[in-house]
Structure formats: C-alpha cells, structure tokens
C-alpha cells in the first residue's frame, strides 16, 4: 500500500489545528495514522510556533517512498528554513 504525508484536522470548531501524519493513501479521513510526524497550528499568532515538524522522521518517510501532499511539502520547506 502507498503511504502519503498529509494533514489530519483536529481541534475545535473555528479553531483548526492539524497533525502532519504518515498514513495509507486509501485510508479514511479520520482513520488512525501510522505515525504523527508533526503539528501545524494556523491560528497561532507567532509564526515560529505555527509549525512543529520532526524533520528526521519526515525525511525517513520521504526516503521510504511516502509522497507528501503539496501543502505538507510547502510546510516542510517553511519549517526547514527556520
């Protein structure tokens, strides 16, 4: 099965927070992820605290063949620039 890196929404109404997860491509939206690689909180006022990504695990999943969604790829690029 193909593994992808994508966002999984968590949080309250009107206060979105996302997990960056490694998950099977055909899995349902709320299903259990193989691994949580990071977190993204767009509501956080501090830009430095919006993205928390375990770069080592992200690189591992990409190396193994997981394909990142365009949004996750952009967030990873932004996180590595810090």
Swiss-Prot record:
Gene3D superfamilies found in the cross-reference section: 3.30.1320.10
Listed GO MF terms: structural constituent of ribosome
Tagged with keyword Ribonucleoprotein: yes
Intrachain disulfide bonds: none
Keyword Hydrolase on entry: no
GO biological process: translation
GO cellular component: cytoplasm; small ribosomal subunit
InterPro entries: Ribosomal_bS16, Ribosomal_bS16_dom_sf
SUPFAM superfamilies given in the database record: Ribosomal protein S16
Keywords recorded for this protein, A-Z: Ribonucleoprotein, Ribosomal protein
Domain of life of the organism encoding this protein: Bacteria
Similarity comment: Belongs to the bacterial ribosomal protein bS16 family.
HAMAP family per record: Ribosomal_bS16
Protein name: Small ribosomal subunit protein bS16
Species of the source: Elusimicrobium minutum (strain Pei191)
């Amino acid at each position: 099965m193909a593994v992808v890196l994508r966002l999984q929404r968590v949080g309250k109404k009107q206060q979105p927070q996302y997990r960056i997860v490694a998950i099977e491509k055909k899995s349902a939206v709320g299903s259990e992820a193989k691994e949580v690689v990071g977190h993204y909180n767009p509501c956080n006022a501090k830009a430095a605290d919006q993205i928390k990504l375990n770069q080592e695990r992200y690189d591992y999943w990409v190396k193994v063949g997981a394909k990142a969604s365009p949004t996750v790829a952009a967030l990873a690029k932004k996180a590595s620039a810090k």
